[in-house]
Amino acid sequence: MFNGLMDPEMIRLAQDQMSRMTPADFARIQQQMMSNPDLMNMATESMKNMRPEDLKQAAEQLKHTRPEDMAEISEKMAKASPEDIAAMRAHADAQFTYQINAAQMLKKQGNELHSRGNFSDAAEKYLRAKNNLKEIPSSKGGAILLACSLNLMSCYLKTNQHEECIKEGSEVLGYDARNVKALYRRGQAYRDLGLFEDAVSDLSKAHEVSPEDETIADVLRDVKERLAVEGPGKASRGVVIEDITEENNVTSGENKKPSKEANGHAQGVKTDVDGLQALRDNPEAIRTFQNFISKTDPDTLAALSGGKAGDMSPDMFKTASSMIGKMSPEEIQKMVQTASSFKGDNPFAPTAPSTENGFTPTPDMLKLASDMMGKMSPEERERMFNMASSLKANAPASTSYGNAEASEPRESLGASGSSSGNSFVAPRSGFEPSIPSAPPADLQEQMRNQMKDPAMRQMFTSMIKNMNPEMMASMSEQFGMKLSQEDAAKAQQAMASLSPDALEKMMRWADRAQTGMEKAKKAKKWLFGKGGLIFAILMLVLAMVLHRLGYIGN
C-alpha cells in the first residue's frame, strides 16, 4: 500500500476539505464511513501499487467537490450492499478498460506514423492517448502512459521542439528518476539548446544506469568534448526549464511553511476536538465507531497510520480493537468524554509539547481504565504478554525519550486497575498509581532496571516467598494496586508454591508484560487521541473510493 497516505500534504488536503464542512456534514460523513467497513476494504485494495500522483489526483478531485455533494454520495455508498458496491466497481473497471483500450489504439497509430517519419501527427496521437489515461490509476495505465511520453519525447526531438521535450522528460523523471530513455532524450534536448552542463548531467546518469549502451557513451563523450572546447555556452537553464512551475511552488511553499504549519497545527487541534465532540454527543456514532474498529482488519488500521505510528504493529492494533469491541456503549461514551476533555496536542504526535505539563489523570479516568482491564480475558492478556516479549524492552533511550516514557504512565488511559484472577502478577504488570503514595515514574523505572540484575531478582524472589499477606498487601499498595487481605493471602500462597526458577521466570515475564501493557495503552491512546486525524484520512479514503467508482473526477 502507498505509505504516502500519511504524507503531510495529503493530510493538509483532507483537512482543507474538512474545514469547508459544517459540523453536521462532518459528523454525518464520519458516521457513514464507519458504518460500512466494506468501503475501507475496497479503498485498501484500490490503493495498492499506487503512486503519489494518484492519491494527489483523488485529493484534488475531493477539493473541487462540494461538501454537501460529498455527504449525499457517501450516504448512498454507506447504504450500498456488497453486491451494489461490486456492481459499481465492475462498471468503473469497464470504463477504465474502455479508456485504456482507446489509449492503446492511439499509441499504435502514433507508432505507425512515427515509423513513417510523420512525427507531428504521431505526437498528436500520443497526446490524445495520454489524455485518455488522465483518470486511470497508474497500476492499470502506467505502462502505456510511460511509453507514450517517451515516444512523444522522440517526436519533439525530431521536430526541434526541445523545450517541450525537456518538459515531457521532466514529467517522466518525476516518477521514474532512473529511466534511461528519458534521461538520454532530455540530455539530447539540452545539448541541442547549447546547455552542455545540463546535457552532461543527464547523459552521465543515463550512462550510469546503462553502462553497456555504446550510443549513450558516444553522445556523452561528444557533449563533454564540446563543453571543453566551447565552454558552458548559454547560461544553464536546466533547472528552470525542467521544473519552472514546481521550483516556484517549492520556493513559495518554503517561504510560507511556518505559517502554513502553524495554521495546520491549530486546525488539527480544532479538528480533533470537533470530531470527538461530535462523537461524544451522538450515541449512534459511538455505536458505529465501535463496530468499525472491531470489524476492520488490524492490517488496515495499521496501514492507515503509515510511518507515524512508531513501533506499533498490527498485533497492537488487534489487541486495542478487541478491547474496544468488548466495551459497552456506556464505556465507549465515557472513554470519548474523557478523551474530549484533554487539553493540547496528542502527546504521541511528532510536534507534541513536553509531557511535563500534561494533565493529571482523574479518579474517573483511572476507574474507567481499571474496568476495561478487569474485563480482559486471560487469552487477551496472554496475547499481550507474547506481544511484549518481542519488543526491545532493554534498548537504550535518550534523555528526551526517557522523559516521555516516564510521564506516559500518568497520561495514558490504558491498563490500570485490578483483577483478582491474576492478583499475584498484578503488582508487576504496570498498573497505574491509584493512591498518592505511589512512587514516581522515574523511581519505578529505576526499580525495573535494578530487577534486571540476576542477584537482585534472586534476593527479591526469596523475599516474596517468605512474605506474609500483610506485607504483600502493603507492597502492592506501593505499586498502585490495593489488595484486600484475602487477595493478598491468595497471592502469597500462590507465590510460595512456586519453585525459585519458576518465580524468577514469572518476574521476567511480568517485566515484559509491563512493557506490553504500555505499548497496548499507546496503541489504544493513538486510536482515540488522533480522532480528527483518522477522520481526515477517512476523507481521503472516501475520495479514493468515489474517484475509483467514477462519482468524482469523471
UniProtKB/Swiss-Prot annotation:
Effect recorded for K181E: Weak binding to HSP70-1 and HSP90-2
* Residue intervals passing through the bilayer: 526-546
GO biological process terms, semicolon-separated:
cytosol to endoplasmic reticulum transport; protein transport
Record PROSITE patterns: TPR, TPR_REGION
Q: Where in the cell is it found?
A: Endoplasmic reticulum membrane; Plastid, Chloroplast outer membrane
List, as start-end ranges, the regions of compositional bias called Low complexity. Answer: 412-423
Quaternary assembly: Interacts (via TPR region) with HSP70-1, but not with HSP90-2. Interacts with ERDJ2A and ERDJ2B. In the ER membrane, associates with ERDJ2 in membrane complexes of 140 and 200 kDa and specifically interacts with the HSP70 and HSP90 chaperones via its TPR domain.
Q: What is this protein called?
A: Outer envelope protein 61
Species assigned in the record? Arabidopsis thaliana
